[in-house]
Regions:
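Extracellular beta-rich repeat passengers
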Residues: 1-185
Length: 185
């Protein structure tokens, strides 16, 4: 998918959903005024590059059991999570801009995330790491090349790149529209 615009959908859950898909590449595209999730990736391999996400009602990119690379993309005014890595996903983020989002980056449920040189500006939360489903292990993240200012991190979660972490408890109770984010439909 190259040089495409996805905007103003009026109904439905995900604008695009990939299920057990390989070698998906989205470049030079725009997702704008999306009702719920812009991209949902289930058990898929996905590269998103030089793509803009703006005014998204839920998540910008939501992955479960997926391998996702996001490079040189922009996320503005995402009402829940700009990027959400869940259920044993591997996410690599590089040189993205996250601005004025509810939550910029989330890693959960035995997922691994690397963030390199991402820029975070005026997000309600820059980063969240927790275990939502207890049958998964804790997630892990390497944020050593990204400046994270505000976060929620579950105790014992392995996070490289943040010093003197102040761990939080009951993170899930603070998300999904309770304090942060948006309730799922």
């Amino acid at each position: 998918i190259n040089n495409s615009t996805f905007e103003n959908n009026l109904s439905g859950d995900d604008y695009i959903n990939f299920f057990r898909s390989k070698n998906i590449v989205i470049t030079n595209s725009i997702f704008k005024n999306v009702k719920n999730d812009a991209i949902d990736s289930d058990f898929s391999d996905l590269l998103v590059e030089n793509t803009t996400f703006e005014n998204i009602g839920n998540d910008g990119i939501d992955g479960s059991g997926s391998n996702v690379k996001i490079k040189s993309s922009k996320f503005y005014n995402i009402l829940d999570k700009a990027v959400s890595a869940g259920e044993q996903s591997n996410f690599y983020l590089n040189k993205n801009l996250f601005e004025n989002n509810e939550i910029a980056i989330v890693v959960k449920d035995d997922s691994k995330l690397i963030s390199e040189e991402d820029i975070l500006v005026s997000n309600r939360l820059d980063f969240v790491a927790f275990r939502k489903k207890r049958f998964f292990e804790l997630p892990s993240a390497d944020l050593s090349l990204t400046n994270i200012k505000n976060y929620l991190i579950e105790h014992s979660t392995k996070v490289i790149g943040l010093e003197n972490i102040e761990y939080s408890s009951d993170i899930e109770e603070k998300l999904y529209g309770n304090i942060y984010g948006r309730a799922s439909n």
